[in-house]
C-alpha cells in the first residue's frame, strides 16, 4: 500500500504545530482511508481543527467528518481534484495554515510548497530579500506584458524582516501545475530557492529566494503562432521542445515562449502556412 503521509508534532518558536507531509497521486479510496487514520489520531486530542475541502464529491466530506467534530486550531487539509488525471485520481495537499500567509512545512521532506497550485487556490509563499526585489519586479512586469498566467495572490506584498534584514513576502500563483519554481519560468527566468524560513514577526513564512535570473535573451520575440497545418504543429511541439503550450482545437493557436527559435526552425522546415503575430 502506498505510504501517503507522515505526521509529527514539534515546536516552532515556542508554538506547537503539527506537520503533515506527503502527496502522492493515489486512488481515491486509499487517500480517504489514510485521512481517516490521521483524523482518529490527532483530532481526538482536541488541539487542532482539520477541514476538508472537496468541491466535487461532498458525499465523502460528510462521511469522513461532520462539522460538530471540528476543533479550533491551526491545521487545514485541502483535498482537490487532480484534473490532469481526468477525475480518476486525487491529489491530497496538507498545509499548516496560520493567520496571514504562514505555512510551516519542511522543505527537505515535502515538495508541495514550491509548486504552483492555482487550481487549488493556494499558490506558493515566497520570501524575497530587499536586494532581489528589483529582479522580481522585472520578471513580474514581463509576465504581465506577455500575458503569462502568473499573479500575486490578492495583489498583496508584505514587508517584514528575516534575521533583522528587510524582506518581502507574498504568495505567487500561476497556471503551471506540478512544476517547481526553479524550472517553470521557461524563457523568463529562474528562481533559485533556498530553505523554508519563518520571518522575525512569526507571521509570515515561505521559500527563501536566493537569486532570480531574468533571461532577457529569450524574451526578444514573444507572441503567438497561428498554425495552419498538422505538419507544422508537429514540428513546433516535437522539434522546438516547447513545454508550455495551449492548443485551441479550431484555430490551432499555440502560446509560446521560445518563439524566435521556433520561427527559424519553421522557416527551414516549411516556407508556407505560417502567420506570426508578435
Swiss-Prot record:
It comes from the Archaea. The lineage of its organism: Archaea, Methanobacteriati, Methanobacteriota, Methanomada group, Methanococci. This is Uncharacterized protein MJ1517. It comes from Methanocaldococcus jannaschii (strain ATCC 43067 / DSM 2661 / JAL-1 / JCM 10045 / NBRC 100440).
Amino acid at each position: 500500500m502506498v505510504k501517503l503521509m507522515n505526521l509529527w508534532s514539534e515546536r516552532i518558536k515556542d508554538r506547537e504545530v503539527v506537520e503533515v507531509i506527503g502527496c502522492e497521486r493515489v486512488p481515491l479510496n486509499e487517500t480517504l482511508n489514510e485521512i481517516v487514520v490521521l483524523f482518529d489520531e490527532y483530532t481526538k486530542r482536541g488541539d487542532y481543527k482539520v477541514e476538508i475541502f472537496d468541491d466535487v464529491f461532498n458525499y465523502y466530506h460528510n462521511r469522513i467528518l461532520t462539522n460538530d467534530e471540528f476543533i479550533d486550531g491551526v491545521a487545514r487539509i485541502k483535498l482537490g481534484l487532480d484534473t490532469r488525471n481526468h477525475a480518476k485520481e486525487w491529489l491530497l495537499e496538507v498545509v499548516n495554515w496560520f493567520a496571514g500567509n504562514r505555512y510551516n512545512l519542511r522543505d527537505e521532506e515535502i515538495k508541495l510548497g514550491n509548486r504552483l497550485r492555482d487550481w487549488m487556490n493556494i499558490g506558493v509563499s515566497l520570501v524575497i530579500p530587499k536586494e532581489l526585489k528589483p529582479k522580481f519586479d522585472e520578471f513580474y512586469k514581463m509576465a504581465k506584458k506577455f500575458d503569462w498566467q502568473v499573479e500575486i495572490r490578492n495583489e498583496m506584498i508584505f514587508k517584514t524582516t528575516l534575521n533583522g534584514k528587510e524582506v518581502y513576502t507574498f504568495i505567487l500563483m500561476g497556471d503551471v501545475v506540478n512544476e517547481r519554481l526553479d524550472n517553470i519560468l521557461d524563457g523568463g527566468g529562474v528562481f533559485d530557492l533556498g530553505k523554508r524560513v519563518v520571518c522575525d514577526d512569526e507571521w509570515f513564512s515561505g521559500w527563501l529566494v536566493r537569486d532570480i535570473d531574468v533571461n532577457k535573451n529569450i524574451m526578444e520575440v514573444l507572441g503567438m503562432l497561428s498554425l495552419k497545418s498538422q505538419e507544422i504543429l508537429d514540428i513546433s511541439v516535437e522539434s522546438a521542445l516547447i513545454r508550455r503550450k495551449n492548443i485551441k482545437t479550431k484555430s490551432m493557436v499555440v502560446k509560446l515562449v521560445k518563439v524566435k527559435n521556433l520561427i527559424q526552425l519553421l522557416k527551414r522546415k516549411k516556407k508556407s502556412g505560417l502567420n506570426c503575430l508578435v
